[in-house]
Amino acid sequence: GWLRKIGKKIERVGQHTRDATIQVLGIAQQAANVAATAR
């Protein structure tokens, strides 16, 4: 039904959000490491 379709869509968006968050955290971690090294 349409309810399951919406659930799938939300699931996919959630997956993208989690991937993006993980990427951002990784970049932030690298930036912190660079800042610590530069100091």
Curated annotation (Swiss-Prot):
Q: Which GO terms describe its biological process?
A: antibacterial humoral response; defense response to Gram-negative bacterium; defense response to Gram-positive bacterium; innate immune response
Name where it's found.
Secreted
Where Arginine amide occurs, the residues are: R39
- In which domain of life is the source organism classified? Eukaryota
- Keyword terms, alphabetized: Amidation, Antibiotic, Antimicrobial, Immunity, Innate immunity, Secreted
GO terms for cellular component? extracellular space
Write down the InterPro entries for this protein, in alphabetical order.
Cecropin (IPR000875), Cecropin_insect (IPR020400)
> Cross-referenced PROSITE patterns, in alphabetical order?
CECROPIN
Task: Give the protein's function.
Answer: Sarcotoxins, which are potent bactericidal proteins, are produced in response to injury. They are cytotoxic to both Gram-positive and Gram-negative bacteria.
Q: Which family does it belong to?
A: Belongs to the cecropin family.
- Please identify the protein, giving its name as recorded: Sarcotoxin-1C
